[in-house]
Every structure is written in C-alpha cells, then in structure tokens.
Amino acid sequence: MSHAISLDSLINLPAMGIPVVNYSPESTWEFGAAAQGYFRLPNQERTSIVQLDGTYSLKNQWYINAQGTLYFGTPDSGLRNKRASAWQLQFRAGYSDRPATYYGTYRDSHFANEGNMGMGMLRQGTPYQLQRGYLNIQAPIRVGKDWAVGPMMDMLVAQYSIAGMYQTPDPLVEAALGVVAQYDTRDNVFYPTRGWFFKVSAAAAWTSRVDIPEGQQPTINALLAADLRQFVSLPANLVLAWQFKAQMMLSEYYISHLTLYPMLPRLGGQDGLRGVNSDMFRDDIMMALQAELRFPIWSIFRGAVFAGVGDVYDYHNWHWAVPKVGYGVGIRAAINKAKVNIRFDVARSNVDPRWNNIQAYSFYLTATEAF
C-alpha cells in the first residue's frame, strides 16, 4: 500500500526537473537540466506546459531554451462546442553560443558523390563559431472542433564565421510573418495513443542581407513547413506512431549558402531523424519519415523501437542521393498523469557504418516524446 501511495504522489506532481544528458558526434557529451510545469487554465480540458532547458557540452557549446503551449478558451460563448472559440499560444525562444561544423550542402561539388558507405567520414567539415538567438510565436484560433488557424511570427539573429570562407561583419537578421493551420484529434498531447495531428505553415521572411549581386537581391524568402502524425492503438496495449515532416526555404534567386547557412532546414536531432548528426545535412528542403512502436514494460515504464528515413535537397538543382536512415531503441518513464515521459533513446544511422565506435551512436535523455 505504501508503494502505491508513493507512486501516486509522484505522478501527480504539477512540475518536474530532470537532468539532461545527450551524446552525439557533433557535440560529444552534453550535460544540463530541464524543468517543466503543467497546469490547466480556467475552463480548459487540455493541459498547458511551460518548459525551460539548457545544456553545456565538452566542446564548450551551450544553449538555453524556453518553450511552451498555453490553452485558452471561452466556454461561455454559447456555441454548441465549448472549445470552438478556444485558442492556444505556442512559443519558443532561446540563445546558443556554440562551436559548430560547416559541412556544406548538396550544391557543393565536393559532397556530391557520397557513395553508399561512410557518408559521415567523407564529410569532415570546417569548424566555425555561431551565436544564435531565436523567437517563434504561433497563435492558432479554434475554428471548429478539431481545426485551428492563426498568425505566426519568427525571428532569428545570427552571427558566425567559417574559417577561411565567410564571416558576418554584422549580425544576420531574419524576420518572418505568416499563417499556421492545424488539425488535432489526439487523445493526449504528450503521449497520444490514437488520433491525427497535422500542422502546416507558410511565411514570408525578410533577411537583412544576402551575398548575391546587387540588383538581384530578393527582399522576401518563402518559409514552408508541414508536420503530419498518426497514432494507432493496437492489441496488447501497443501504440504505432508515425510522422512525416517537411521544411522548405525557397527564394527566387540562387542565394549563397554561406550567407544563410544557419537558417537552412536540417536533418536529424533528438526530435527529428534520431541518430543523424543534426549539423551535417542542410539545404533548401528537408523531408523525413519516421515511425515508432511503443510498448509496455512494467508499471510506469514503456519501451520503443523506432526507425526513420529522410534527406535534404537543393531546390535549384534537385537530384537523388542515398537516403539517410536512422534507427534505435528507447525507454520511457511516465512521471505524471498528464502522461509526460522521461525519455532515453539510443540511435545510430547509415551515415557512419562503424559498429564498434561510440561516435557512430547518439544518446538522448530528455523529457517528452520526439513526436
């Protein structure tokens, strides 16, 4: 009985703090912490979340990030569906100062012929220093039971130098305004077991400068993004989850990737194609498909096996290359009744074929699911 009371006390906590430990080839070991708070605003069925996290790596890389989703509503509107006029505020803001690696893009000729093995070994990269601040705000307004449409804004300030290749004399500033639409029938925001989620956004972005001939400088770039997920309940308390994600940065002219490199869509990372170096593959377009089978283990613990495939593409010179494949296993621990999980994943990819080298693996310890 005492064990049950202790466990119930744990999963009813309105907030939590956990250590964050990640390992990936681009950063080696990262150590930090994440704190999250969970609450329901008045007359709301869904749980709002606010998160603060940060890490410091053995390569003297650091970042701090704040993000969250707040659910608001006006159930006294008299509408048949009490959530019909609800709206939500999604935000993400942060700053990072980290040595990074410039690997180029597919339009760079020395990366065009990769072959089927050792893609990561061919991409040795050039170290560079990057300071980056960002702010993203979205405010979808409920227009039906499951649909929401609203404005969005995005701002990025970056300063960086790529040794012997490029240096920003002044910070590069990007500001974007657009619209976001989403469809959501998930039974739970943090750990869904059934339902669909679809979000698409389109924005016009202005950049402070680009390195192309005078008179051809575009004033506007197009930023497009799509995120489609499905969650399927299976027998034996299994859940099959899959996601297709695409990001595009398009412009009328052939912009130097040295200028806009930190802004380009990228593949990989702890919430993307796990196991793939998140600095290695960037270009105008990113597309990825991943799936995950989630299964019970014991008490608050669940497991997962996952795999995904994706790549980046040059909008001006589309071509086929060897797809990047990431795969791995993980374990989750549910820490409250909102179904927020502590997640530990181990992943690798076909980018580095070595099985006996730790640099071919990525480790992620964090909160919430990848998707």
Residue ranges, per PLM feature:
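Short, solvent-exposed loop/turn segments at secondary-structure boundaries
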Residues: 165-166, 212-216, 316-320, 354-357
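Gram-negative/organellar outer-membrane beta-barrel architecture
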Residues: 7-17, 21-173, 267, 280, ...
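Short, solvent-exposed loop/turn segments at secondary-structure junctions
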Residues: 311-315, 350-352
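C-terminal outer-membrane beta-barrel translocator/porin domains of Gram-negative envelope proteins
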Residues: 177-182, 186-298, 303-309, 313
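C-terminal soluble interaction/assembly domains
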Residues: 321-322, 339
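Outer-membrane beta-barrel proteins
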Residues: 5-8, 36-43, 69-80, 137-145, ...
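Hydrophobic, lipid-facing positions within transmembrane beta-strands of outer-membrane proteins
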Residues: 15, 31-33, 62-66, 131-137, ...
